[in-house]
């Protein structure tokens, strides 16, 4: 079985902030760590999207793991679907003759609700291997002051996007759901060229 990519996206609904490509640059694992800094009780609504892509057959995803301050956090699987893409239309030259005929993708969408009342850590991950857990990116978020800080820890393609893109709302949200009225002019942070911590307002 050849897996080309396992990936994760996290959407913080009320914060209007998304974390894209939360998977390792090398290796079949995905995840991220959120450090939330608040001073009063807050309910944090999140959508978490996990995807696995293969060129040979549909590959099942392991269930999402989530923790809040070290304790298990409930996740609700709200949607799961498979897609198949015909790649033969791209095999138009000798350069592309080794391209596989089809690409298979499995997508799972989870709803996650966390009740927090102080500084808290939320972890999402697709494996329990210590080798991968130490390599996940860390994002510090202060919802009250509307700022976040990215700490790059191994995933060179991870991005934070705010506000959430309309294209993502249309893909993952039902009509009339909580993203209505949000614009599509995002501020995009790409941490691919830096290993330094960076502060951003949103």
From Swiss-Prot:
<dbReference type="Pfam" id="PF03287">
    <property type="entry name" value="Pox_C7_F8A"/>
</dbReference>
<dbReference type="InterPro" id="IPR004967">
    <property type="entry name" value="Poxvirus_C7/F8A"/>
</dbReference>
<comment type="similarity">
    <text>Belongs to the poxviridae C7 protein family.</text>
</comment>
<protein>
    <recommendedName>
        <fullName>Probable host range protein 2-2</fullName>
    </recommendedName>
</protein>
<comment type="function">
    <text>Plays a role for multiplication of the virus in different cell types.</text>
</comment>
<dbReference type="GO" id="GO:0016032">
    <property type="term" value="P:viral process"/>
</dbReference>
